[in-house]
């Protein structure tokens, strides 16, 4: 294995290997993959960072599985409090893991309505109080930030509410892997207080499609085996080594002046926004 024997029309077949001696194993990593993940952990400033070759969808299921494992025993039917603009991967996870969802809806006058679904800390606190009045305690709070229009939630304020209620905050940060590398300082969910977070590296970083990160904050007590088992539960036993190698190569990119390059990119985007607004006011969304 693989059947192409390292030869084929694409030209990348020689890099497409499987779990052989010296190549490590993603869900039991202790060699080169574990070392690469340790490098990513340092780059992102997290407690622990793990690789996925099946996108944030795999990470979403894994972090929800971990959150369910952390809930108190005999806590009743599990329910998750989630902003309504969640990706369908959350719905698939709810079906697989058998939990209920209590939606957080945007305010009636919120700009962007359902696509952005801004959630204020006060609204989250009220929603938690309403659930408590029903005798229900969610096993976590789930946000999508940034959303599909680039809106970033007040993760710091929302995480403070979650932690005051003893709940973990889970963030789908699929579109925001770059947020840790902003020149003015990190706006990544983990640094803002999130407990579990996923990034689709392939969306905003130089990584092959399917490459994603599962990040853990310092408050998550799950051991190494539990996290890897959670990922393995929803992943293929034949993870793509091409995707893994592209993630490792991206580590080198992130470590080599990436903040400065990202700042130049943001400046160019700002110029483009101003030019578009000059053509028609409101045509370009503001940068966040």
Question: Could you tell me what each predicted segment is?
Answer:
Residues 12-58:
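Conserved N-terminal alpha-helix of the aminotransferase class I/II PLP-enzyme fold
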Residues 1-13:
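N-terminal glycine-rich, Lys/His-bearing helix-loop that initiates the first secondary-structure elements
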Residues 5, 21-24, 30-31, 123, ...:
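Solvent-exposed, flexible loop/coil residues
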Residues 10, 16, 35, 54-285:
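Conserved PLP-enzyme active-site core in the AAT-like
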């Amino acid at each position: 294995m693989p059947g192409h024997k390292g030869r084929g029309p694409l030209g990348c077949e020689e890099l497409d290997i499987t779990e052989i001696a010296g190549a490590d194993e993603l869900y039991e990593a202790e060699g080169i993959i574990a070392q690469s993940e340790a490098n990513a952990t340092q780059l992102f400033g997290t407690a622990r960072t793990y690789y996925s070759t099946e996108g944030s969808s795999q990470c979403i299921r894994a972090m929800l599985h971990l959150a369910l494992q952390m809930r108190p025993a005999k806590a009743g039917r599990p329910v998750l409090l989630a902003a309504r603009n969640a990706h369908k991967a959350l719905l698939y996870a709810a079906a697989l893991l058998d939990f209920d969802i209590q939606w957080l809806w945007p305010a009636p006058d919120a700009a962007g309505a359902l696509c952005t679904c801004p959630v204020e800390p006060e609204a989250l606190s009220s929603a938690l109080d309403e659930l408590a009045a029903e005798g229900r305690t969610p096993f976590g709070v789930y946000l999508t930030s940034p959303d599909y229009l680039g809106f970033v939630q007040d993760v710091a304020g929302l995480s403070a509410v979650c932690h005051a209620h003893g709940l973990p905050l889970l963030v789908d940060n699929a579109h925001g892997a770059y947020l840790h590398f902003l020149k003015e300082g990190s706006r990544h969910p983990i640094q803002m207080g999130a407990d579990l977070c996923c990034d689709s590296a392939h969306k905003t970083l130089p990584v092959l499609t399917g490459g994603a990160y599962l990040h853990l904050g310092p408050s998550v007590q799950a051991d190494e085996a539990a996290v890897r088992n959670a990922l393995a539960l929803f992943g293929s036993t034949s993870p793509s080594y091409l995707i893994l190698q592209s993630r490792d190569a991206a580590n080198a990119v992130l470590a080599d002046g990436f903040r400065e390059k990202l700042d130049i990119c943001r400046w160019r985007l700002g110029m483009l926004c101003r030019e578009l607004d000059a053509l028609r006011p409101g045509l370009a969304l503001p940068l966040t």
